[in-house]
């Protein structure tokens, strides 16, 4: 299969400015294509996983992936899909976040100097040096305010009578300039992004064609939700991060292990590298034994993100906990100051401290609802004092919230 054929087959396709022509060009030659990422956290999460898999697919077919870190545009904030202005972040935050994002991406794609090796650029490199009057003179006449006002990112905010600052309104101009700059300096001919970016992408393609007469394209992916309508990347416990310093490989495994039944075949197609033949076998397995299929899905996706050994460890830990009732030290672990446990800490405070509840009131509610266990024993008194007498032989205390969330406490 060609890049475009596999792109469509895997369910990544939503819209393209000229699919027939792009298909022809990518069959005949290798291109450079880019995807941009906000520089607002020290790791990407699974909400970006489809875009990452597309970068990987580009590289697989010999095309050059360009990753844009929005160091410049992050200072403004994209209004697309937002009800209010995003907080601006500092240069120091951007530098730290860029390092973490490259760590996330390096799990999936190869960076380097080769023809199909990925490169990562910060758009602050060219946006920070733009002179406002020069920009207006050279590019302002190519943008139609009438058209900009019809774009969903702007129109919806105005219809709801929500504040839209001139700062945010300029975001789409700068993103359009990114495409022009990458086309000129890196021979980039394709921008990819989520369907909410369609207006911005089309503006960039139009600007580039008008100024340089180059043939460029835009292509978008569908916005994904789970079968129940939840946004990809977030859970009640927080974001499903790709970097292990923010989320352990075991917890990453457990996210996929616990996904909704209706999602597993779709997720296998989107996020794994199973062949079409293997996907048919997987779909049959899901019809016969949904839990076995979930374990395979979780293993495959954890292996891709964290490596074979971590995926194997996560699988074994999950089996020990849920099928054999054992405690495994590969579980997420928090360390408490010895004095805290020696003096004793109430159950609700400990569950909050361990991250099994987002607030103390939620921890109380969890315990009252009979959803909390200490060392596999149900606790019903939220004020019960947990101290060193609860330490097991391996010097840990096992906390459980519901059937699927477990944490070890050490001192």
UniProtKB/Swiss-Prot annotation:
Reactions it catalyzes: tRNA(Tyr) + L-tyrosine + ATP = L-tyrosyl-tRNA(Tyr) + AMP + diphosphate + H(+)
Chain positions recorded as ATP binding sites: 234
Record-annotated S4 RNA-binding domain positions: 345-411
CDD domains: S4 (cd00165), TyrRS_core (cd00805)
EC number: 6.1.1.1
Key word RNA-binding present: yes
Alphabetical list of HAMAP family matching this protein: Tyr_tRNA_synth_type1 (MF_02006)
Name used for this protein in its record: Tyrosine--tRNA ligase
UniProt source species: Rickettsia bellii (strain RML369-C)
Gene transcribed to yield this protein: tyrS
């Amino acid at each position: 299969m060609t890049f475009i054929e596999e792109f469509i087959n895997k369910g990544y396709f939503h819209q393209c400015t000229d699919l027939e022509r792009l298909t022809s060009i990518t069959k005949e030659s290798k291109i450079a294509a880019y995807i941009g990422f906000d520089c607002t956290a020290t790791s990407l999460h699974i909400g970006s996983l489809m875009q990452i898999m597309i970068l990987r697919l580009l590289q697989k077919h010999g095309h050059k992936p360009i990753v844009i870190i929005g160091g410049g545009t992050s200072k403004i904030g994209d209004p697309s899909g937002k009800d209010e202005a995003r907080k601006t972040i500092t240069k120091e935050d951007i530098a730290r976040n860029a390092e973490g994002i490259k760590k996330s991406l390096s799990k999936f794609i190869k960076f380097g100097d080769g023809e199909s090796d990925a490169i990562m650029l910060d758009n602050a490199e060219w946006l920070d040096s733009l002179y406002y009057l020069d920009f207006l003179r050279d590019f302002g006449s190519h943008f139609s305010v009438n058209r900009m006002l019809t774009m969903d990112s702007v129109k919806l905010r105005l219809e709801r009578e929500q504040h839209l600052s001139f700062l945010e309104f300029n975001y789409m101009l700068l993103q359009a300039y990114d495409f022009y700059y990458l086309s000129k300096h890196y021979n980039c001919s394709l921008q990819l992004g989520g369907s909410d970016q369609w207006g911005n992408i089309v503006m960039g393609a139009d600007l580039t064609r008008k100024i340089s007469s180059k043939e460029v394209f835009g292509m978008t992916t569908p916005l994904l939700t789970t079968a129940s309508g939840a946004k990809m990347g977030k859970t009640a416990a927080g974001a499903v991060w790709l970097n292990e310093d923010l989320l352990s490989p075991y917890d990453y495994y457990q996210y996929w292990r616990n996904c909704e039944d209706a999602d597993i075949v779709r997720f296998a197609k989107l996020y794994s590298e199973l062949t079409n033949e293997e996907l048919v076998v997987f779909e049959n397995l899901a019809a016969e034994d949904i839990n076995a299929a979930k374990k395979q899905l979780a293993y495959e996706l954890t292996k891709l993100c964290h490596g074979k050994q971590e995926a194997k460890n996560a699988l074994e830990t999950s089996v020990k906990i849920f099928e054999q009732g054992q405690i495994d030290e590969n579980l997420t672990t928090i360390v408490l100051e010895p004095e805290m446990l020696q003096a004793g800490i109430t159950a609700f405070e400990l569950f909050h401290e361990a991250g099994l509840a987002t607030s103390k009131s939620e921890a109380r509610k969890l315990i009252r609802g009979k959803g909390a266990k200490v060392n596999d024993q149900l606790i019903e008194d939220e004020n019960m004092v947990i101290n060193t007498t609860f330490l097991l032989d391996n010097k840990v205390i096992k906390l459980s919230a519901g059937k699927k969330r477990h944490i070890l406490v050490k001192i």
